[in-house]
Curated annotation (Swiss-Prot):
SMART domains: S_TKc. The gene is hog1. One of its GO terms (cellular component) is cytoplasm. It catalyses: L-seryl-[protein] + ATP = O-phospho-L-seryl-[protein] + ADP + H(+); L-threonyl-[protein] + ATP = O-phospho-L-threonyl-[protein] + ADP + H(+). The modification Phosphotyrosine is found at residue 173. The TXY motif contains the threonine and tyrosine residues whose phosphorylation activates the MAP kinases. It is found in: Cytoplasm; Nucleus. One of its GO terms (biological process) is stress-activated MAPK cascade. Its cofactor is Mg(2+). It comes from Neosartorya fischeri (strain ATCC 1020 / DSM 3700 / CBS 544.65 / FGSC A1164 / JCM 1740 / NRRL 181 / WB 181). This is Mitogen-activated protein kinase hog1. Activated by tyrosine and threonine phosphorylation. Keywords: Activator, ATP-binding, Cytoplasm, Kinase, Nucleotide-binding, Nucleus, Phosphoprotein, Serine/threonine-protein kinase, Transcription, Transcription regulation, Transferase. Residues 20-299 form the Protein kinase domain.
Length: 366
């Protein structure tokens, strides 16, 4: 029977099963605290993410449910994988994943990257994106701190809490500004998998230069910086802008010509610059796709078309438009957790869990 132990981390109570020991804080986000730990069952280091107050609002409940569903569905070498999930007696949710030693943000702030590492990291990012996009998922928040790396240079994309369905009417304002695609800033709608390619291009440029390519102070300044390098958006892109205020702002900017990226990236290989040119394109319809980018000459040392898999089936987004109360999201979440642990929802464990005795159910059947 699983026992729960409590520890105070940054003033936050971590309440986890005794399977996990040696808790050490490694990161704090808007929605959760992440600690490293040792899995007593496997002897391996793991990352334990506590989702803060997952059932406090319907929005948070839905966000947590979405992240859980995605982590269960996405199984790929370059995507973080879920090894355990449980709900504590206090009804906090904990995701357990593999632990990687660092992230790309930390690497980039510590030293310049050599060419072969830039190539290998970009290859793995695009390999992961090809799979994610084939599942009908857009990450939406790709940035260096969401790209985890271990001592063998294996790379995994994490944090799918903001991920969304591929939807031509996709709305919202989500990714960290420096890596945000212009169509998100320009229209707040009608964006798709191409936003991740733009973000990957910004990350690629940062690996080449050692600093962010478009470090905007706010979204107005951000867009202005982008046009200084890439020129004024073409008319057909401007025509997609739905907001009158945004349209006025874009038209008020001075006309600018696209600058050759070779002038800015003087030390980069021509193949690297060519791929970057294809990733950082204003018109998302003309932006290179992940599968095409993997076949680009720059990534020839790593490209293997027989080992760049797509998802076997599309992710089921049928829940995403649902406007449900917290209790319903909670029951759906419990059901997913039971499914993850291969517990039959019709047996006693399922009944106890569905009736709210989640901690007891976990203790008896973990």
């Amino acid at each position: 029977m699983a026992e729960f132990v409590r520890a105070q981390i940054f003033g936050t109570t971590f309440e986890i099963t005794s399977r996990y020991t040696d808790l050490q804080p490694v990161g704090m986000g808007a929605f959760g605290l992440v600690c490293s730990a040792r899995d007593q069952l496997t002897g391996q280091p793991v990352a334990v993410k506590k989702i803060m107050k997952p059932f406090s609002t319907p929005v948070l409940s839905k966000r947590t449910y979405r992240e859980l569903k995605l982590l269960k569905h996405l199984r790929h070498e370059n995507i973080i994988s879920l090894s355990d999930i449980f709900i504590s007696p206090l009804e906090d949710i904990y995701f357990v994943t593999e632990l990687l030693g660092t992230d790309l943000h930390r690497l980039l702030t510590s030293r310049p990257l050599e060419k072969q590492f830039i190539q290998y990291f970009l290859y793995q990012i695009l390999r992961g994106l090809k799979y994610v996009h084939s599942a009908g998922v857009v990450h939406r928040d790709l940035k260096p701190s969401n790209i985890l790396i271990n001592e063998n240079c294996d790379l995994k994309i994490c944090d799918f809490g903001l991920a969304r369905i591929q939807d031509p009417q996709m709305t919202g304002y989500v990714s960290t500004r420096y890596y945000r695609a212009p169509e998100i800033m320009l229209t707040w709608q009608k964006y798709d998998v191409e936003v991740d390619i733009w973000s990957a291009g910004c990350i690629f440029a940062e690996m080449l230069e050692g600093k962010p390519l478009f470090p905007g102070k706010d979204h107005v300044n951000q867009f202005s910086i982008i046009t200084e390098l890439l020129g004024t958006p073409p008319d057909d892109v401007i025509q997609t802008i739905c907001s009158e205020n945004t349209l006025r702002f874009v038209k008020s900017l001075p006309k600018r010509e696209r600058q050759p990226l070779a002038n800015k990236f003087k030390n980069a290989d021509p193949e690297a610059v060519d791929l970057l040119e294809r990733m950082l394109v204003f018109d998302p319809k003309k932006r290179i796709r992940a599968g095409e980018a993997l076949a680009h000459e720059y990534l020839t040392p790593y490209h293997d078309p027989t080992d760049e898999p797509e998802a076997e089936e599309k992710f089921d987004w049928s829940f995403n438009d649902a406007d449900l109360p917290v209790d319903t999201w909670k029951i759906m979440m419990y059901s997913e957790i039971l499914d993850f642990h291969n517990i039959d929802q019709g047996n006693d464990a399922g009944q106890v869990l569905m009736e709210g005795g989640v901690a007891q159910a976990h203790q008896n059947y973990a």
